[in-house]
Structure formats: structure tokens, C-alpha cells
Amino acid sequence: MTDTADHEHVLIVDFGSQVTQLIARRLRESGVYCEIHPYDKVDAVLDSFRPKAVILSGGPASVHEAESPAASKRLFELDVPVLGICYGEQTMCDVLGGKVEPGTTREFGRAEIEIVRESPLLDGLGGAGHFEPVWMSHGDKVTALPMGFETVAVSEGSPFAVIADEGRRFYGIQFHPEVAHTPRGALILRNFTHKIAGLKGDWTMKAFREEAIARIRDQVGDGRIICGLSGGVDSSVAAVLIHEAIGDQLTCVFVDHGLLRLNEAEQVVTMFRDHYNIPLVHVDAAEEFLGALAGVTDPETKRKTIGRLFVEVFDREAAKIEGAAFLAQGTLYPDVIESVSARGGPSAVIKSHHNVGGLPDYMKLKLVEPLRELFKDEVRALGVELGLPPQFVGRHPFPGPGLAIRIPGEVTPERVAILQKADAIYLDEIRKAGLYDSIWQAFAVLLPVRTVGVMGDARTYDEVCALRAVTSTDGMTADFFEFPWEVLSRAATRIINEVRGINRVVYDVTSKPPGTIEWE
């Protein structure tokens, strides 16, 4: 729980939907601070968190299942507006005395609702008789409304697609306004928070910056703090924010594992030492990391080897910093949400997480996580607010294990150098074409596959380079980017001509799912 007493805020009750985070992102985009908490922790949350409005998320359960999650009755006794989305509408109706039954037909995917009555929830969409495209995902449906509710909109499969008790300001919608497939869903959510709940939308990065600085000073006092710097956006923004708060009480430790992009280590050192004058310990551990990776070809073993060694090197260097009492990490809000998710339960490990979980317990450092309230796009906005170069905060995501997971097979110094050059050429051509900011992530992969080629009159037998570029909003799903062919042609020609060791270039047109964005 964060200190947000100076902000109007919304409580989002999570019933296990895969897209609950999108509700929070839409609200934050409209300047409304919100927090997500699991349905079974709500009563405890309400003892300290005083929401101005409540949103009940969707979820995979049926209200007819034994021990199905139910909305706490306390939520309807707060005298604040409540919006139930999909399962949230169903559990609200069930708790308030309505009726929910299994649907004879299910609604999944694109659908249309017909507005039959005006409501401030749907202001700006159209009056009675207007049809609005939405995204449905439900099997059960409400068949009888609780007392005080009226129908606002219907759909082919749901007679109560939108319902409202205007007196108590309780609303239910059977579709998902938070997803991009509901084109004007953000407007519906804004109507709820701004028009119905009367919120001003005062959540800005300028306000967050001022409050975060005050919190850091209060937490750290005159203590010393260590920040692990990876060169990525999250740790860099955290470091600059902390330095603004406490100055040279901060020391950054930059462990260079030799697996960064071309010239990236030098850029990080220059920016933090010369531009921001932040005390920085630069550890060139490339030889140590590459030595540990010799002979390793399994992707998960690579990740674990890099993670283990990173902790060892960081531990070794941090121990040299006298009087350190705090450790700063760039934890983001999605990490916090997942740790207390209503979904819970075991899940398959697709890939171990990029980030290191912290230092060994014996170091007794207290954790400082100044970004734990923020989503990735908010971190970028905060970086701009703090004066970080836009080209830096706008960089594409880069994995913690670095180029090691973009080199299938054994990672050697020679293969790293080849990939660094190919990747730099690829990104250079993307920037020249003005496409960099239209792409979520772009990178080159060096494959452990050799092919025959011809250079001049000579035969070559070199490795293949795969180029990858995807569009996405959150990294959970992704589509391959449809380049103009001349951009790919220029990149491929330059790579083959300028990078010794590559004689063939291919483009990856796999979406996620079924593939992942990274190759390993």
C-alpha cells in the first residue's frame, strides 16, 4: 500500500482476469491514481485505503461454482460509485439480489451493444438506438436485475449488457472496456471516474516526482544507498530519482557483463558520471561472465548462470561500499501485482525472470523501490520529467541476460562481437527510416547455423543472422512488424557487407503467441 492521501484514488478489485492491469493503465492514462488488490484481501485493504470509486474486474470463474470469488458487501456500503466489468457485473448482481445463470450461448470476441437508455456512463457514445462495437468474453449472464437497476444497453447474447442504478451510482457492463478491441472503452472508464465519481485526474509524473523524493528522504534519512545499474530504463530512472532526493548518499554499481549492445556500456558510464555526476562503480566483468558461459548452450542454464554470477559480482562490489544500509531496485507495479494476484497458483515456467531478486540476506540491506507504483509507460514519462534524454527513455526493452539469449548455442567473445555489429546496423537503418518509435522491440539474433554463400569469386561458409521486430502495447502479445521491404533490404545488405562472419539474413514473421518475442 502506498501513501496516496493527497490523491483521489480508485480501488480495482481483482477477480483473476488476465487483463486487470489494463484497467489500471487506462485509469492512470486519464490522470487517476488506482491500486489493484485481490478480492479476498479487500476487507483488510478498506481499513486503510479510502477509495473514491471501486471497479470490480472480470475473471474466469462462474458465480455458480463452489467457493467462487464474491464481491465483499462492504464495497456497496462505502457510498462511492461501483463499476462491475464482466464477472464483476455478475458478482455484483449476485450479491445485491439479482440472478445470474449459465448462458445458452456464449459471447466471445467482437460484438455490438445497442443503447436503449441514456446514462452518464455512456456519454459521448450516442443516444438510444446507437450500436457500439465492444469486446465480449463471458459464458454466464445476468437474467434478473437487483432492485433499483435498469437496463442501459443490450446485446445479441445479453439482455443486460449495461445496467445502472443511478441513485446509488452502481453500474455493470458485460464487456471489457479496458481492451483495445473496445474502441471507446477508455471513454467509458473516464465517464465513470470523472463524470460519475467526480475525480479531477490529478495523478501526474510531476506530482509523483515530488512525492517520491519526499518519501525517499524520509525512508533513507542520512543513510547510504546502493543501486544496481543495468543500463536499462528502469534502473536508470530509479537512480536519477534517488540521486535527486539524496545526492551523493547514493552509489551506483554498474556490472558490465560484456553482453550489452555496441558501445552501450560506455554510454551508461558517460551519462551517469559526466552528465549526472552520480557516484558510479563500473565493474568490467565481461571476461568473468563469458568464461562462465563457455560450453553452455541451454537457454535456461544461460539465464541462471548470468543471474547467479551477477549477484556474486554485485555482492563483492557492494561489500566494498562502507556504511551502505539500503539497496535500490527498479521494481515496477506489474511485479507487485503479480506477487499478490488473485490468479495465484502454480504456473509453468516459460523462462526464468530477467531481473535479479536482490542481494543475499546476510547483507541486511533495506529495500528501496521508488518505482513500485508505476507501469512501464509511466516510468518513461518520469524519465522525461527528470530530464533523461528522450532517446534513452524511449529505448526498446532489453533483457537482463543481454545478448546471451540472442545467441542460440554457445556464447563466445567472437559471436558477441559479430552480433553487436549486426544489431547496431539493423537499429541504425530502422532509425534512418523513422520507424524506431513505431516498433515495440527490434533486435538481431545470431543463429548457430552455417550456410554457403558467395562473396566476389570466393565461397563463404558463415552464420545466419535473423532480424526480429514486433509491435505490442504491453509485451504480453505481439505481432511482427510489417517493414517496407527496402528497409529490410538495406539492413541485410549492410550486415552481409560490413560484418565478417555473417553471409545470410532472414526476417522472423512469428507472432506471440505462439512464439515468444525473444528467441531464448
Curated annotation (Swiss-Prot):
Which superkingdom? Bacteria
Catalytic reaction annotation? XMP + L-glutamine + ATP + H2O = GMP + L-glutamate + AMP + diphosphate + 2 H(+)
> Keywords of this protein's UniProt record, alphabetized?
ATP-binding, Glutamine amidotransferase, GMP biosynthesis, Ligase, Nucleotide-binding, Purine biosynthesis
Question: What Enzyme Commission number does this protein have?
Answer: 6.3.5.2
Active site per database record:
86, 176, 178
Query: What pathway is this protein a component of?
Result: Purine metabolism; GMP biosynthesis; GMP from XMP (L-Gln route): step 1/1
Tell me the enzyme class.
ligase
Q: Name one Pfam family in it.
A: NAD_synthase
- InterPro entries, sorted: Class_I_gatase-like, GATASE, GMP_synth_C, GMP_synth_GATase, GMP_synthase, GMPS_ATP_PPase_dom, NAD/GMP_synthase, Rossmann-like_a/b/a_fold
Domain Glutamine amidotransferase type-1: from-to ranges: 9-202
Annotated GMPS ATP-PPase domain ranges read: 203-395
Q: Does the keyword Magnesium apply?
A: no
Q: Does the keyword Nucleotidyltransferase apply?
A: no
Q: Which GO terms describe its cellular component?
A: cytosol
Which residues are recorded as binding ATP? 230-236
Single GO molecular-function term? ATP binding
What Gene3D superfamilies does this protein map onto?
A: 3.30.300.10, 3.40.50.880, HUPs
Quaternary data = Homodimer.
PANTHER family per the record? GMP SYNTHASE [GLUTAMINE-HYDROLYZING] (PTHR11922:SF2), GMP SYNTHASE-RELATED (PTHR11922)
Free-text function comment from the UniProt entry: Catalyzes the synthesis of GMP from XMP.
Tell me the protein's name. Answer: GMP synthase [glutamine-hydrolyzing]
Q: What is the lineage of its organism?
A: Bacteria, Pseudomonadati, Pseudomonadota, Alphaproteobacteria, Caulobacterales
